[in-house]
Regions:
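Phosphate-end processing signature that detects enzymes handling 5′-triphosphorylated RNA
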Residues: 1-171
Length: 171
């Protein structure tokens, strides 16, 4: 959720990310109340708020694969700055470029409910952020120039995987 202090009726997001046999990533996302999402994950109950049959099918597949009862295991919180390209920049074609910067990342594997506040263990070192650039197709030269100028390199990173490793002392 993007709500500062979520309540039981606050909208929350469920995202399921997976890769197919060819390694192509797929993402399913829905918005509903936390209770509707918990019910779907734990006992398969589909609330009227959940209208995406593909996502429901994916959840049912995961429930079958992992023993029918999925439950929250990790809480991850961060502050996000989201930027997107203006519709038109003189001299440049519009390319739908988006940049997100996540900071103040914390996690916990106990009391994982949204309703237990935002506290947790730091996920990254102090003063580190995660910047994600989404540029469909080829990155424009101006973006490549900025990344090169500041020594920024592409790197894969999973917030959940990092939090899991830290919680298990595998770091």
């Amino acid at each position: 959720t993007y709500i500062e202090t979520p309540q039981a009726v606050s909208p929350v997001f469920l995202e399921v990310k997976s890769k197919d046999e060819e390694g192509i990533g797929h993402k399913f996302r829905l918005v509903a109340t936390s209770q509707a999402i918990i019910n779907l994950m734990t006992d398969g109950t589909v609330d009227h708020q959940i209208q995406d049959p593909d996502l429901v099918q994916e959840i049912q597949r995961l429930r079958k694969r992992y023993g029918h009862r999925l439950e929250p295991r990790m809480f991850i919180y961060y502050d996000r700055l989201s930027l997107k390209e203006k519709k038109s920049i003189q001299g440049y074609p519009y390319q739908k470029i988006r940049v997100t910067i996540d900071q103040n990342l914390v996690f916990r594997d106990q009391a994982v409910s949204l309703f237990h506040g935002k506290k947790g263990e730091p996920l990254l070192e102090d003063d580190f952020v995660i910047m994600e650039i989404k540029a469909p197709g080829q990155e424009p030269q101006w973006l490549k120039d900025i990344l090169e100028k500041y020594g920024l390199v592409k790197q894969k990173f999973s917030k959940y995987s990092c939090a899991y490793h830290k919680s298990q002392g595998l770091d």
